[in-house]
Amino acid sequence: MKRKKSVGVYHTVLKDGTPSYRASITFEGKHISLGSFSEEKEAAFVYKEAYKILHSNSFSLSSYKENMHIPYEKFVCLINFRDKGMYISNPIYLEKKYFTYHLEPGLFLKFDIEDLFYYSSHKIMKRGSHLFVADYGSQLSILQRYGIKSYAVEGRDYHFVNDDPTDFRYENIVILNRYHGVRQFAEKGFIKYKTVIHVRSNYVVGKYNSEAEAAIAYNKAADILIKNGIKKNFQMNYVEDLSPSQYADIYMKLKVSPKLFRVRADHA
């Protein structure tokens, strides 16, 4: 007697001859792949769960259980498709003016709706506390999309307005220090900028009234140290909104700590 095939499951064979079972489902005219599995029984379970999710409003984003067979990412995709009528292959759920990107049960990130196209085609990965995407073959921290440097420290270089480190909507992120070696601080009620450069230990280059001056001071300090024989690949600051002549004028007039001129390779 011929064994009955499982609904929504298709048997295939991999290049090495290993059997594989693909599960898929069609909903609202959309054919959705649910994944490939090594056992037909597992693929059948995934199809059944997908069918229930799509045809029952009793399932919500918080309904996922560890003993479910369907992968969590696919679970989110189906909930969003059922509720919003838009299928997105990444685990995204659309809200009115923003969307959430779900990394695991109970952990999701918020983004502005204008970032939907990017995150629909770029998968977010998590390693420890580091969140990144694969972009053109390299790992790109999601903070870099806001102009936040890889060495930036939360609370010192940037902060979240509502104290929620999972809320990446633009209005919630304030960048305090955009440039390498520059730190913002308050002095007598005024915002100032301190420039620090590291050669074995930290050297204070100076304190400045503007962020641009502080950034250029870092570059000037690096030039002095390199001229003194310090062999280090200093990460220079690119200062926006300044013409070459404006940059040169500020560079020449800026005062830096005299100590920098005494730092030599044999003393560093």
Question: Can you name each region flagged by the protein language model?
Answer:
Residues 1-268:
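Boundary-flanking segments of nucleic-acid-binding domains in nuclear regulatory proteins
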